[in-house]
């Protein structure tokens, strides 16, 4: 069935049966929409409006949270450490991920592909840059945490090394956004209710299948493996360290080898382990649905991918942009102190960190990390 015939049938259905997706799309724009979506009934307008309101909430929370992170980390001298440059890079990714949501919101309030292919390409390019950039930054933060905690004497990255890492992150990320928009490999197309856009995972060609498998490997699997590996190593290191301390204390006939300052920090190592689990969970929760959906579209049963189902992964990806600033930075004591200093009306009541805190604790208090 050709795009033109689908368009004709959608416009001239007799009164009674629901209109099909794409009924209000100009004929010249239909070529940009995978035929898969054009056989589904148009959703109730209230679903469009509900999603638009949800995205307005996501946008407000993400811009506020990530904007505060960028402001505080750049303004506070005590927070301008090499490790925190990764946190700022992640906040920039999450901030700009939500900059594109007005396109989705406008399309939703107009119940369809209102901004056309140009809006779609802008939406997808920004989404690819920020989504893949955030994934690789998460992996870099995992390595930084592992290196700092496992090798506290010589494992900390210098400012120059972190800058090099960030340059490499964007060098790795940018081609995945440019290739589809320039028509070099893959393409960006509308999906779901035709209000959002992503890379094409539905067209039944070898080129698209290879592209989907490649981007799935390089933008999802590799960061995921690195994150899980480095955080599992952190947890293993913490467990072994605690075990060694207990055994040494037993040999010396004392209850603990920790100083009062370390005791009052309430086992910072445990906080690292908890942060690690949270980070892995958030990454899996936010990006796995999208990864699974794209693989089903390219290699599985496409009938499983209804418009409503495909809107769920899009929402989970946006939700994590709201959560990242809270997991990475707002739980960070030094960040909270600086926030309290600049915005006292928040009444955070964060206690100043003692200078006598152990090396391990200081390592932990580099911003706790998050998909």
Swiss-Prot record:
Post-translational modification comment from the UniProt entry: Phosphorylated on some or all of the serine and threonine residues present in the C-terminal region.
Modified residues (N6-(retinylidene)lysine): 318
Keywords: Chromophore, Disulfide bond, G-protein coupled receptor, Glycoprotein, Membrane, Phosphoprotein, Photoreceptor protein, Receptor, Retinal protein, Sensory transduction, Transducer, Transmembrane, Transmembrane helix, Vision
InterPro entries xref list: GPCR_opsins (IPR050125), GPCR_Rhodpsn (IPR000276), GPCR_Rhodpsn_7TM (IPR017452), Opsin (IPR001760), Retinal_BS (IPR027430)
Places the protein is found: Membrane
Entry keyword annotation includes Phosphoprotein: yes
Residue ranges that the UniProt entry lists as topological domain Extracellular: 1-52, 106-121, 183-209, 300-302
Source species, domain of life: Eukaryota
Membrane topology listed for this record: Multi-pass membrane protein
Glycosylation sites: 3
Disulfide links within the chain: 120-197
Matching SUPFAM superfamilies: Family A G protein-coupled receptor-like
Entry's Gene Ontology molecular function annotations: G protein-coupled receptor activity; photoreceptor activity
Transmembrane segments: 53-73, 85-105, 122-142, 162-182, 210-230, 279-299, 303-323
Function: Visual pigments are the light-absorbing molecules that mediate vision. They consist of an apoprotein, opsin, covalently linked to 11-cis-retinal.
Family label: Belongs to the G-protein coupled receptor 1 family. Opsin subfamily.
Name this protein carries in UniProt: Opsin, ultraviolet-sensitive
Annotated gene: UVOP
